[in-house]
Regions:
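Hydrophobic/aromatic-rich transmembrane helices and adjacent perimembrane loops
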Residues: 141-171, 175
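Internal/C-terminal transmembrane anchor helices
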Residues: 169-195
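A C-terminal functional module that forms or caps the active site or interfaces directly
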Residues: 132-134
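Short linear, low-complexity motifs centered on an aromatic residue
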Residues: 87, 164-172, 345-355
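C-terminal luminal/periplasmic domains and tails of membrane-associated envelope-modifying transferases
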Residues: 209-252, 261-265, 269, 273-472
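An aromatic- and histidine-rich active-site surface loop
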Residues: 148-152, 256-265
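Small/polar loops that bind or transfer phosphate-bearing groups
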Residues: 34, 254-255
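Transmembrane catalytic cores of multi-pass membrane glycosyltransferases
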Residues: 1-129, 138-149, 187-212, 423-425
Length: 472
């Protein structure tokens, strides 16, 4: 069901529904073809084949797969460093661990009973272990009930696959138990109160929601009515005035940092960045892709910025979410219209307003040492570059970070605000102070009170640079 959810408009329970249909489809295959292992192999083979076809259609080469995999790992590691949350419902993790232990036991039993070649057994074992690992990282890195449901969705096929060599009775019991497991996962997964199973007692309401969803999928009238209601609710939430809507209809826009559903709500022309949710740029590579796209945008393109996110955005400072992109936006773009929390930016007619960075000091700092940021003055920005010491983490900490989530993520404290920053951005220029003569804009509110102090949760070297600017 389409609805307003927090600060965006999205299909309700989209992830859960997607995985539910995937599991149901797999169950049907398994019931028709009792040798579940074959259906799993068919599913994985189809997935790999389609991936390769799409990869080649997109004019990529096989050699590029290695680079793609390397960058994917870097992005995933940075995501875990920045976005990891404390576990809201430990029982979900306990359930997952129990399932994982059962999976490993089944894997061992299967190898003892199976007459397959060693290569087949090794490949199948690696595949099962990968599914366990992917489920753990997906479900419990950035812990949320929907994410935890994804973990079970990844684990359940492994259990079915491994149940294949066991007696038919046990296999049938495993298959019959799956709908109950899926149902519990869905009930637990729909945003219950933290630390409780309160949603388990709301099944009549959930049944009503599922009936509404079925009507939405099968009735054009219901779909249009729900879509109109969602569009109206979204417009009420975003609150753009008529003038801003008119200006945006004249110029294709990118919405920063993430609210692309605004484009749908108002029917606006959209020209997104390659990573259209710019706060998701977790590595210098993604930052560079977005920065290049910003420089290549048409002269009539605009950027619509939601300045209500100047502070904490998923534990990060909005101005630091993509350092090169944010600095390029600061130097080459300018605000042209304002409407409450929204600012429309366009390319600066006179080009880049920033001069070359000038170093004004370097200091070796210990963990959590407070440093005063130099004053910016009326016509210059101050940027800070921090490089962490090459301290080698303990084996235990490294293993935990790889398998689960960082126990002590890297943080930067700016004044009274504590923010996270991906380790991949070591050496990136972060805006820490803005010119006192800056045009009126809320985008820099977090760094404009001067002088601020800054500290880092690890030891390293901090360098401050002054970037001179002109008013136009």
């Amino acid at each position: 069901m389409v609805k307003v959810y927090y600060n965006t408009v999205q299909p309700d329970l989209y992830n859960q529904s997607l995985h539910l249909f995937s599991i149901i489809g797999f169950l049907l295959l398994s019931l028709v073809w009792w040798r579940s292992r074959r259906s799993i192999l068919i599913a994985w083979g189809s997935l790999v084949a389609w991936f390769l076809v799409l990869w080649l259609i997109s004019e990529h080469t096989f050699e590029g797969l290695v680079d793609w995999a390397r960058r994917s790992v870097a992005i995933g590691s940075a995501y875990a460093e920045v976005q990891s949350l404390s576990l809201g419902q430990p029982i979900l993790l306990v359930m997952y661990v129990v399932f994982a232990i059962a999976t490993v036991i089944l894997l061992v039993r299967r190898h003892r009973a199976c007459s397959s070649t060693r290569t087949v057994r090794i490949v199948s074992s690696l595949l099962v272990l990968f599914m366990l690992y992917a489920g753990l990282k997906t479900g419990f890195v950035r812990e949320g009930n929907a994410h935890a449901f994804e973990a079970f969705a990844l684990l359940i096929p492994a259990l079915i696959w491994l149940a294949a060599p066991i007696r038919v009775t046990v296999r049938r019991l495993a298959l019959l138990a799956l709908p109950a497991v899926v149902g519990i996962s869905i009930l637990v997964g729909e945003r219950p109160a933290v630390g409780s199973f309160s949603s388990l007692y709301n099944w009549p309401e959930k049944a009503s929601v599922w009936i509404d969803d079925a009507n939405l999928l099968t009735s054009t009238v219901v779909f249009e009515r729900k879509a109109d209601a969602a569009r109206g609710a979204a417009q009420a939430f975003y609150g753009l005035n008529d003038d801003m809507v008119r200006w945006l209809r004249e110029s294709p826009a990118q919405v920063d940092p993430f609210d692309a559903s605004l484009i749908w709500a108002y029917g606006l022309p959209w020209r997104p960045m390659p990573i259209f949710q710019t706060y998701m740029n977790f590595t210098p590579f993604l930052d560079g892709v977005t920065t290049t796209a910003l420089a290549d945008r048409h002269v009539d393109d605009t950027i619509l910025i939601d300045t209500s996110w100047v502070g904490n955005l998923d534990y990060r400072l909005s101005l630091w979410t993509s350092p090169r992109y944010q600095l390029a936006l600061t130097c080459s773009w300018t605000p042209i219209h304002r409407d409450g929390r929204w600012e429309q930016w366009a390319k600066n007619p006179s080009g880049d307003r920033c001069g070359s960075p000038q170093s004004i000091g370097t200091e070796n700092v210990s963990a959590n040492q407070i440093v005063t940021i130099p004053a910016s003055g009326p016509d210059s920005f101050i940027v800070a570059t921090f490089t962490r010491s090459s301290a080698v983490p303990t084996v235990l900490a490294g293993a935990i970070n790889l398998l689960y989530k960082p126990l002590d993520p890297f943080t930067i404290r700016l004044g009274e605000q504590e923010m996270r920053e991906p380790p991949t951005f070591d050496g990136s220029r972060l805006i820490v102070s803005c010119p006192s003569g800056l045009p009126v804009t809320r985008r820099y509110e977090a760094v404009c009170p001067s002088p601020l102090t800054i500290s880092f949760s690890e030891s390293g070297t901090v360098t401050f640079e002054r970037i001179p600017t002109r008013s136009s």
